[in-house]
A protein has these predicted regions:
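Long, contiguous binding/interaction regions
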Residues: 2-45, 49-81, 86-210
Length: 210
């Protein structure tokens, strides 16, 4: 008589731990964990071609990611542009944004910037001009520049990090802000660190050719 397979009885065998879905597939604890949203900036190097920004913004809107600002501008290479996105998402959402951006054909490289990255914004404010001396004093205090001054309105610009811009706007409220235009963040990695790996690789190739 043939003996059966050796080993413990089914009820005595070790069972995989963790929850499973209706199909019996184990649920990854990391995906189930509750992650608090955090605010961060992503820098993407993209090909300078028509429609790239539309593809990126369309991807973000379809996935319903919480994006706070998006800026774009050319780099030292006229064939590429830098897109800086500020998002507020839980950790899995941030990683998902990175993955989805990397899948866009025209995106060359994308990475999350560290907390020490250099970030700057610009705000243009038009305020009532009844107290020009006080307006000028506030402008000077924030290292700003007067762009236009007339008997009824004064327009100034301020550049700086997010906190400085927020503080400046609050300071100008006493005069009555008629209009305001604020850019999103643009950012670069600090020191000798490259903002994207693709830029570092391109620089190294040019050095070899020289």
């Amino acid at each position: 008589m043939t003996e059966g397979l050796q080993g413990p009885a089914p009820g005595e065998r070790p069972q995989p731990s963790g929850r499973r879905n209706a199909q019996g597939i184990r649920i990854d604890p990391e995906m189930e964990a509750v992650h608090d949203p955090r605010r961060t900036a992503l820098s993407a190097l993209v090909q300078n071609e028509p429609g790239v920004l539309a593809k990126i913004s369309g991807l973000i809107s379809r996935r319903q990611f919480n994006i706070e600002s998006l800026t774009v501008g050319t780099t030292t290479n006229p064939e590429t542009s830098r897109v800086t996105l500020v998002i507020e998402e839980p950790e899995p959402g941030i990683r998902q944004v990175e993955k989805q951006l990397a899948k866009v054909v025209n995106v060359i490289s994308v990475r999350e910037l560290g907390d020490d990255a250099i970030r700057r914004e610009l705000v243009v404010l038009k305020v009532h001009g009844e107290e020009p001396d006080k307006v000028n004093a506030i402008t000077d205090m924030y290292g700003g520049e007067t762009l236009d001054a007339g008997p009824r309105t004064i327009t100034v610009q301020i550049t700086g990090d997010e906190q400085k811009i927020d503080d400046a706007i609050d300071a100008f409220r006493q005069f009555g802000i008629r209009e305001l235009a604020r850019t999103g963040q643009t950012a670069l990695a600090r020191g000798e660190e490259w903002t994207t790996h693709a830029e570092e690789e391109r620089y190294e190739r040019t050095q070899v050719r020289q």
